[in-house]
Amino acid sequence: MVIILLLVFFVGSSVSQPCHPNDLSALRELAGALKNKSVTESWLNGSRCCEWDGVFCEGSDVSGRVTKLVLPEKGLEGVISKSLGELTELRVLDLSRNQLKGEVPAEISKLEQLQVLDLSHNLLSGSVLGVVSGLKLIQSLNISSNSLSGKLSDVGVFPGLVMLNVSNNLFEGEIHPELCSSSGGIQVLDLSMNRLVGNLDGLYNCSKSIQQLHIDSNRLTGQLPDYLYSIRELEQLSLSGNYLSGELSKNLSNLSGLKSLLISENRFSDVIPDVFGNLTQLEHLDVSSNKFSGRFPPSLSQCSKLRVLDLRNNSLSGSINLNFTGFTDLCVLDLASNHFSGPLPDSLGHCPKMKILSLAKNEFRGKIPDTFKNLQSLLFLSLSNNSFVDFSETMNVLQHCRNLSTLILSKNFIGEEIPNNVTGFDNLAILALGNCGLRGQIPSWLLNCKKLEVLDLSWNHFYGTIPHWIGKMESLFYIDFSNNTLTGAIPVAITELKNLIRLNGTASQMTDSSGIPLYVKRNKSSNGLPYNQVSRFPPSIYLNNNRLNGTILPEIGRLKELHMLDLSRNNFTGTIPDSISGLDNLEVLDLSYNHLYGSIPLSFQSLTFLSRFSVAYNRLTGAIPSGGQFYSFPHSSFEGNLGLCRAIDSPCDVLMSNMLNPKGSSRRNNNGGKFGRSSIVVLTISLAIGITLLLSVILLRISRKDVDDRINDVDEETISGVSKALGPSKIVLFHSCGCKDLSVEELLKSTNNFSQANIIGCGGFGLVYKANFPDGSKAAVKRLSGDCGQMEREFQAEVEALSRAEHKNLVSLQGYCKHGNDRLLIYSFMENGSLDYWLHERVDGNMTLIWDVRLKIAQGAARGLAYLHKVCEPNVIHRDVKSSNILLDEKFEAHLADFGLARLLRPYDTHVTTDLVGTLGYIPPEYSQSLIATCRGDVYSFGVVLLELVTGRRPVEVCKGKSCRDLVSRVFQMKAEKREAELIDTTIRENVNERTVLEMLEIACKCIDHEPRRRPLIEEVVTWLEDLPMESVQQQ
C-alpha cells in the first residue's frame, strides 16, 4: 500500500507551456553531462521544456516550474549535474536503473520541496554525508544498488520519511536510534547488503509503524530484541545472512500480520516454536542454514497461504506429520539436509502449484506416494541421499509429472534392476541416478527424453556397451557413466553429440531463482560442486573406471565445447589422438591407467586452460611437452611410463645438448637412453646380460657428465655466433637497473644461453630464467612466448610505460632486450620465489608461512595492486592476479609480477585468450560473458589469493583420493553451512586468533562476490587488511 501511495507522485502529463528560465538552464546543463542522446537531444532545442521526455511541470501558463523529473531505465550515462539543485520546485526525482556514475552532488540538498528521490541501480559512489540532509519534506528515499559508502548515520534523519532504501551499498557502522526516532511514520526500511555491525537495538523506535524491515546480508550479531515481537504492523521481516544467534521466542505469535519471515544463514538454535497457528497470513518462511533442532512444527498446517517453506540445512528430525492438503498455493518446499525420517505423507501430492520439492539428505524411507502423480506443476524434484525403494514404481509415478525438468534420485534404490518400460519425461533436462547400485544395461527409454542435457549414471552396476543411439540425444552435453562395468569400444556416435560440438545456449526451464543448488559429485565421498542452473554445468564426458577397450577415437576432436574428459582406468590401447589438442576449452584430461603407447602429442601445449592432466600408468614414450601448462603438472601426472622423459630433466636435456655439441659422444648417450627405458625387462635375464647392463649404467653416467661439462663450457664466441645468426640484437636498461653496461652477449651468458637448469618459473607469458652476472648480482629474465604483434617502436613504448610503474610491492622492470625473434624482459630477482611455491610446493613452506607472514604478504600484494589501479599513469589492470605472480624477496615482502604483459602479446598466443583472460581458478565469472578485463575482475582474482592464504589450498585442486573441487565453491558451501572455521589451514590453526583469520576470509568473500558491483575497490581491501592484527598466538 505504501508503494502505491508514493507512486501517485508520478501520475501526470507534460504541460504544453514554456518553463521557468532557471529550470530550462538547469535541464540543459544536466543534458550536457549525460551521454544518451536519444533522451536528451530534444532538450537542447527549444525552450518548452515542459514538453520534454520525462519532464513534468506545474504553474502559470506563462512560466511553469518543473515539479517532476522521471527518467528511469533510459540508458543514461555520465554524471549527475550540480545544476539539479536549481530545480527548486522539484517534488519527484527518479533517475533509477541507469548507468550514472560519480558522486551524488551536494546541491541536491537544496531541493527543499523534494518528496520522492530514487537514484537506485546506478554506478554512484562516494559519501552521502550532507548530500541529502536538507531534504526536509522527503517521504521516499531510494539510493539502493550503488557503491555509496560511509557511516549509515551519514544518510541523515527526515521527519516525514515513509520509505528508506539504502540496500546493496557499502555503508558501515551500527544502526543508530535516530533513524526512526526522527520519523514517527517510517513503514519501509531496507538496510540489506551493506557492512553494518552491532545488534538490532537501534531500531526500537521503528516499532510503532514499520511494515517492511530488511536488514539481510550484513554483519549483525546478538539475539532478536523483545520489541521486535511487538511490531503488530510488521508484514515482512528479513534478517538472513548475518551472525544473529539465540532462539526464536514464542512471542513470534504476536506478529499476526506477518507475510514473510526470512532468517536464513544465521546461528539461531533450539527448536522452532510451534506458534504458527496465529500467523495465518504467512506466505514465505525461510529458516534455512541455522542450527535449529527438534520436530517439524505441526501448527504450520494452519498457514494455508504459504507459497515458500524452506527449512533446509538444520538438524530437524522426526517424521513429517503434517496434512499438506490445505497448501493450495505452496510452490517451494525444501526440507533437505536435516534428519527427517519415516515415509512421505500421501498428502504431499495434493499441492497443485508445487514447482520445487527438495527432500535430499534426510532419512526418509519407503515408496514414493502414488499421489505424486498429481504434481502437474512440478519442475524440480530431489530425493537423493535417502532410503527410498522400488525404482520401477517411482518412475511409473513420476512419468505423470509432465513438466518435470530436474530429477535427482541419487543414493536410493540400492541394488535394484533398471526398468526397461519407462515412458514420459518429455521435458526432463537433468537426470541423476548416481550411487544407486542399479543393475542392467543403459536403458533405451532414455532416447525418449528429447530435452535431456545432463545424465548421471555413475557408481552403478551397468554392463554391456555404450549404446550407439546416444549420439541422437541432441541436447545432451554432460555424461557421467563412470564407475560401472561397461565394456566394448566408445561408439563413434558419442562424437556426434550436437551440444558438445556447438553449445546451442538454450538452457532448460530449470528454475535458478529457488536458490536450491545441484551438486555434481565426482566420487562417493565428496560434497560436489554446486550448479544453480543447467547452463552452469561444464560440458563433460566421464567414462572412467569401466572396462572399455579399443582406441581413443580421433573424432573426439569434434567436441569443441568439451571441458572435462576422463577416460581413466579402462583398457584403451593405441596412441593418443592429436585431435584432442583442438579442444580449446578443455580443463580436465585424464587418460591414466590404460594401455596407451606412443608419445604425448606436442600440440597439447596449446591447451592453455588445462588444469588437471594425467597419462600415468600407460606405455608412453618420448618427451613430455615443455610449453604451456605442462610445467605446472606434477610428476604423478606422468609416472608409470618408463619411456617418458621431461624436457627440464635428463635425458631430454642431454639430447638437446648433443645438437649443440655434435662432437660429443651422442651414440653412447642414445644407447644409454635406450637402456634406461628398457631396464625393467632385466628381471628374467641371465647374469651375464645383467653385468652388461650394469656396465652400461656406468658408461651412461660418464657420458652425461661429459655432456654437462660441455654445456657449462659454452663460451662467448659460441653465443656471439648464435646471436649473429638470429639477426640484430638490442638491449635497453632503465635507471633502476644495477648493471648499466650489460651487453646482449653477457645477458645470454648469464642464463647459460637459456639453459633448462636456469629455469625458475613458468607462466602464461613465457619461461623465466635466473641470470647470474659476473659481479654476483642476479636478475630474472622473462622470455616472452607469444608474438608481440607490434612494431618495435610500439613495443618499446609499452615496455617503457611499464617501467615507470614503481612501487615497493611491484617487481620492478629493469630493462628489455630484443634478440632475434625473442623479446626478453629483465626484472629484479626475488630470492624466495613465488607465494604459490611456498604455499603449495615446498614441503616445509608452512613452517615459514606463519599467520603474520601471510598477512604481511596479503597487505603488500594489495598495496601493489592498488597502485596499479589508482596511482600508476596510465592505470593498469593486471588481468592475471594469482599466487604464482606474487613474488617474495629475502624478507618475504610481497611483489606483484606480470602486470601489463597482456598488452605486449597477441591474445591468441597467451593465457589472455579471446575467450577469457586470466588463469583457471582465478577467472571472475563475468569474464565468460565479456572480453573486457576490469579492476573488479582483478579484485576477484585477489580474493582467490586471500582464500589460498587462509586455507592453504589451490584454487583448483589436483585430485587427491576422493576430494576434488574448486576452492571458491567449497568456501561458499562451508560458509553457508556456518563451518568457516574448518576452512582454516590446519598448519596455522593452533597458533593464530581464529577470529582474525575469519575476518580475512570475510574480506576474501567480499572480493569474490559473483556480482562485480558488490565487490570492494582494492583500496578498501588495503584498508581492511591493514586493520587486521599481526600478532600470532604463541604456542603454549
Swiss-Prot record:
Result of knocking out the encoding gene: No visible phenotype.
Signal peptide (from-to): 1-16
UniProt membrane topology term: Single-pass membrane protein
SMART domains: LRR_SD22 (SM00365), LRR_TYP (SM00369), S_TKc (SM00220)
GO cellular component, one term: chloroplast
Intervals holding LRR repeats: 89-111, 113-136, 137-159, 160-182, 185-207, 209-231, 233-256, 257-279, 281-303, 305-326, 329-351, 353-375, 377-398, 403-423, 427-450, 451-473, 475-498, 561-583, 585-606, 995-1020
Origin species: Arabidopsis thaliana
Active site annotation, chain numbering: D880
Keywords from the named record: ATP-binding, Cell membrane, Glycoprotein, Kinase, Leucine-rich repeat, Membrane, Nucleotide-binding, Phosphoprotein, Receptor, Repeat, Serine/threonine-protein kinase, Signal, Transferase, Transmembrane, Transmembrane helix
Modified residues (Phosphothreonine): T751
Similarity comment: Belongs to the protein kinase superfamily. Ser/Thr protein kinase family.
Gene behind the chain: PSKR2
Residues where ATP binds: I760, G761, C762, G763, G764, F765, G766, L767, V768, K782
Gene3D superfamilies: Phosphorylase Kinase, domain 1, Ribonuclease Inhibitor, Transferase(Phosphotransferase) domain 1
Residues covered by the Protein kinase domain: 754-1025
Compartment list: Cell membrane
Catalytic activity: L-seryl-[protein] + ATP = O-phospho-L-seryl-[protein] + ADP + H(+); L-threonyl-[protein] + ATP = O-phospho-L-threonyl-[protein] + ADP + H(+)
EC number: 2.7.11.1
Name listed for the protein in its UniProt record: Phytosulfokine receptor 2
Major enzyme class: transferase
InterPro entries tied to this protein: Kinase-like_dom_sf, Leu-rich_rpt, Leu-rich_rpt_typical-subtyp, LRR_dom_sf, LRR_N_plant-typ, Plant_LRR-RLKs, Prot_kinase_dom, Protein_kinase_ATP_BS
Location of Phosphotyrosine modifications: Y827, Y867, Y922
